[in-house]
A protein has these predicted regions:
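A conserved beta-turn-beta hairpin within the catalytic core of GNAT-like acetyltransferases
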Residues: 31-34
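Conserved N-terminal beta-strand and adjoining loop/helix that marks the start
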Residues: 2-23
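A short gly/proline-enriched turn/hairpin at secondary-structure junctions
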Residues: 37-38
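Unchanged
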Residues: 44-138
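Charged phosphate-binding loop/patch that engages nucleotide di/tri-phosphates or the phosphate backbone
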Residues: 129-156
């Protein structure tokens, strides 16, 4: 099946802001470069977006103590580069179409734990939102530029 005929995976993404309006990013364990991303993941069958968002956030970061500031109305998507199609998601999808949420972290940093059942991140940090496009893999850069506009509407 040609790449363009593969469906998009339905997912969620989570923008987690701390009290200084910095954004949580994690360093993926399967990417050896110095690339960081915000938590994201797939929506399970029968699951709504908010439930999926909360589940993914706990699965990846152990973060439970959040307040939803905004459910972004637009669905954003990205396509995988050709060298990753067929490898990621067992070759079933060509990219991901995501519902994003902007949240406020109400807890303390020591509540963040990456040593979860199926760890995806090996490190994490808080960064300034304007640095997001510089830390993400190239094929998600346009997505992160759009998300930066959404973040700026909330924190300005």
């Amino acid at each position: 099946m040609a790449n363009h005929q593969l469906p998009m995976r339905t997912g969620v993404g989570i923008i987690v802001l701390n009290n200084n309006n910095q954004v949580f990013v994690g360093k993926r364990k399967d990417n050896p470069g110095d690339k960081w991303q915000m938590p994201q993941g797939g929506v399970d069958k029968g699951e709504d977006f908010i439930t999926a968002m909360k589940r993914e956030l706990i699965e990846e970061t152990s973060i439970k103590n959040i307040k939803i500031l905004k459910e972004i109305q637009n669905m954003y998507q990205y396509e995988l580069p050709n060298n990753l199609v067929g490898i990621i998601w067992k070759g079933k999808f060509r990219g991901q179409r995501q519902k994003w949420f902007i949240t406020k972290f109400l807890g303390k940093d020591d509540e963040i734990n990456l040593d979860t059942q199926n760890p995806e991140f090996i490190d994490w940090k808080w960064i300034n939102p304007q640095d997001l496009p510089d830390v993400i893999v190239d094929f998600k850069k346009e997505l992160y530029l759009n998300l930066l506009k959404e973040i700026n509407q909330v924190i300005d």
